[in-house]
């Protein structure tokens, strides 16, 4: 069996574009699709250990504005996303050293020491364990959002789709 993986931060029309399945972060309301939630994710502030050695740890939200912040902004989305509004929801209006339109770019920028970024916990946990990233202001929590397998409704599941579904279930049980 082989698989083709297509990664994007853009919204897709799963059925129209002929995909067998998708992974969606957040709540999805589409009657043409069925969803199965495998996990929840939240957003955490993090920075590289090198950045924190050089610039120090902010002690509160107000101190964030004097740090180098990595802002994620995705103008193509029709509704606000958890990452886009992260700093605004905290009341932080300045300190943006870098604005990117891609979560992976923010992730790699944070690892390279460019600043403090709001990133999904599932993405940064391995880097916390390796000591490459550290949490900043760990008392700040965000609402959890589901990680969902998305499938076209009224379509028979192929063996490869069932295998993919089983793989996801196993992966997220860890």
List PLM regions with ranges.
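A late-sequence structural motif
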Residues: 136-174
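Central regulatory/effector-binding core of bacterial HTH transcription factors
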Residues: 1-34
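Generic recognition of short, well-ordered alpha-helical segments
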Residues: 17, 33, 56, 162-163
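C-terminal regulatory
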Residues: 12, 28-144, 174
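Residue-level signal for short, function-critical loop segments
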Residues: 9, 49, 153-155
């Amino acid at each position: 069996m082989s698989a083709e993986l297509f990664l994007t931060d853009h919204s897709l029309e799963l059925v129209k574009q002929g995909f067998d399945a998708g992974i969606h972060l957040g709540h999805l309301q589409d009657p043409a699709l069925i969803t199965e939630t495998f996990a929840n994710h939240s957003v955490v502030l993090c920075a590289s250990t090198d950045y924190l050695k050089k610039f120090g740890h902010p002690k509160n939200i107000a101190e964030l504005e004097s740090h180098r912040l990595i802002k994620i902004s995705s103008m193509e989305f029709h509704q606000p996303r958890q990452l886009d509004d992260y700093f605004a929801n905290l009341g932080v209006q300045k300190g943006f050293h870098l604005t990117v339109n891609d979560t992976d770019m923010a992730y790699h920028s944070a690892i390279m020491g460019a600043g403090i970024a709001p990133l999904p916990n599932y993405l940064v946990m391995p880097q916390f364990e390796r000591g490459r990233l550290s949490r900043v202001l760990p008392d700040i929590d965000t609402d959890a959002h589901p990680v969902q397998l998305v499938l076209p409704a009224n379509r028979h599941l192929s063996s490869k789709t069932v295998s993919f579904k089983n793989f996801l279930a196993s992966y997220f049980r860890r």
